[in-house]
């Protein structure tokens, strides 16, 4: 996703997928049973209904700062728009979309800028669900089970399922020796032995299920679907993607309360203080913040 959006100079070559993982809801087992999500196909509309009823809250990374959050967000939009061939700029202005996606994102009770950090945050306790990579739901469950705690049940929203691809590409700077070293590394990572080791970490290496010897990692009692044939949604163009992310940042996401603690001690005199002020200007001056999708929404509170 970000590789495609960021390679504006078309310098990346030899890109090949090393692993993939769907972005799913991991819901506390007991709650998933209560919601009727166990052993059945679940839609984004079903998830929205659970959020609207106050029965489901979840942790999710920021769509503007993390691939898992962005992938989930695009999947939500895709489903709420009725599964179009592709999301367009006009699609984003569809009547009712703003209200629905805002209601869905109102269920986010904690956020993070990283998928791994989100998993670590979730494991501190006190949360019912998280949206994350399937491989990190598996990892979280391995730790929860080792602690003797309730595990998560994986829910795959069938009408808005995003697949996170992990391609490895070479940034071409004209160095043929480095390019060959890259190709050797890529060949190693794509070898059968290493692909099997990657699959043992809970990451898939293809769209048509997992190998028999690794099924013990992809446990069906956790809701993991090792035999599911993954059909990824079609991602929008880079321009539409950025438009959607700006709407997420300024209109759709749950407003945040942010408290900044700034160090004005003597040790910050001179360059340190100048750099701190410059950093804050990149966040608080909205024209600057927009360049990195950090702008505030109308109802946000900054202290």
Feature-to-residue mapping (PLM):
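Short amphipathic alpha-helical coupling segments at ligand-binding clamshell hinges
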Residues: 176-189
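…and closely analogous acidic/polar surface helices at protein-protein or active-site interfaces
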Residues: 254-256, 261, 266-303
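Periplasmic-binding protein-like
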Residues: 13-25, 95-104, 112, 147-174, 188-210, ...
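Acidic, polar low-complexity linker/tail segments
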Residues: 206-260, 264-274
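N-terminal segment of the mature folded domain
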Residues: 1-55, 59-62
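Extracytoplasmic
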Residues: 13, 18-22, 53-55, 62, ...
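Ligand-binding pocket segment of bilobal, Venus flytrap-like solute-binding proteins
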Residues: 78, 83-156
């Amino acid at each position: 996703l970000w590789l495609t959006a960021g390679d504006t100079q078309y310098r990346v070559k030899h890109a090949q997928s090393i692993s993939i993982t769907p972005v799913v809801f991991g819901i506390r087992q007991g709650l998933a049973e209560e919601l009727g999500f166990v052993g059945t196909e679940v839609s984004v509309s079903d998830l929205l209904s659970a959020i609207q009823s106050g029965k489901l809250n979840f942790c999710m990374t920021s769509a503007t700062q993390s691939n898992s959050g962005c992938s989930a967000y695009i999947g939500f939009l895709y489903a709420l728009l009725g599964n179009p061939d592709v999301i367009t700029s006009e699609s984003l202005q569809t009547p009712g979309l703003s209200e629905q996606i805002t209601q869905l994102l109102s269920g986010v009770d904690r956020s993070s800028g990283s998928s791994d950090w989100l998993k670590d945050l979730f494991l501190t306790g006190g949360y019912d669900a998280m949206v994350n990579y399937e491989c990190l739901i598996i990892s979280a469950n391995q730790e929860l089970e080792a602690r003797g705690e309730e595990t998560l049940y994986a829910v795959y929203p069938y009408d808005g399922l995003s697949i996170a691809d992990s391609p490895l590409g070479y940034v071409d700077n004209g160095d043929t020796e480095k390019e060959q070293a890259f190709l050797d590394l890529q060949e190693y990572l794509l070898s059968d032995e290493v692909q099997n080791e990657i699959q043992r970490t809970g990451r898939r290496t293809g769209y048509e299920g997992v190998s028999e010897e690794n099924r013990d990692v992809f446990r069906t009692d956790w809701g993991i679907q090792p035999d599911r044939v993954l059909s990824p949604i079609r991602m929008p163009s880079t321009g539409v993607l950025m438009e959607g992310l700006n709407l997420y940042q300024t209109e759709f996401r749950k407003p945040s309360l942010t408290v900044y603690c700034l160090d004005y001690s003597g040790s910050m005199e001179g360059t340190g203080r100048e750099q701190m002020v410059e950093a804050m200007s990149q966040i608080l001056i909205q024209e600057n913040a927009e360049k990195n999708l950090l702008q505030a929404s109308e109802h946000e509170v900054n202290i």
